[in-house]
Amino acid sequence: MRKFIPLFSLVLLLNGCISSGPTDNVGFDKFETIRELEGIYQNLGEREQGAPPVYLSQVIWPKTEGIAHAAITAIEVRLLSPNTLGVRASSKDGVEKEDTFVEGKDFEIHSGRIRLKPSFTIGGLKPEAPILGLFYERDELGFDRKGHGKLRKQVGIVGLVYMHMPLAAGVNKEVRFIRIDKVPNP
């Protein structure tokens, strides 16, 4: 029986949740209409010290090739219709990317936040992979209580480590995107 105590302790250690965020991180505030999202936001997000950079443009266009995210300085959000947002990424050289996003097709609004479509993947199908399991990822965008843009990235996994040890873990990463201007100039 004593042999199983260290193994059980290790399983408990591997199951858990980790959260991180920028200095002076504050919670989400709710918005009533997507018109409130109009504004210009800093592309480079604020995170905990020492963390790799997160760009708002990467959250908006995660699978688009050829975007120099580090060169983009600002993201402009405009309301085009009651359920459509126009988003423009700008650098010092001009517009890098522009797109429209429609509520119900590209995003959902839940509890005063934008929820991007979640992704589910199965990992560990290669023989050398240490974890076999289901991976889940979801991004939520909105405002923090100071009026700045806020991202919460939720990542979770449920699976087996080396096909023997159960694992359930989650990570919440929060990023602040400074709101440079509340209403874009026409």
Q: Can you annotate each of these PLM segments?
A:
Residues 10-11, 84:
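Short, linear, compositionally biased motifs with a strong N-terminal bias
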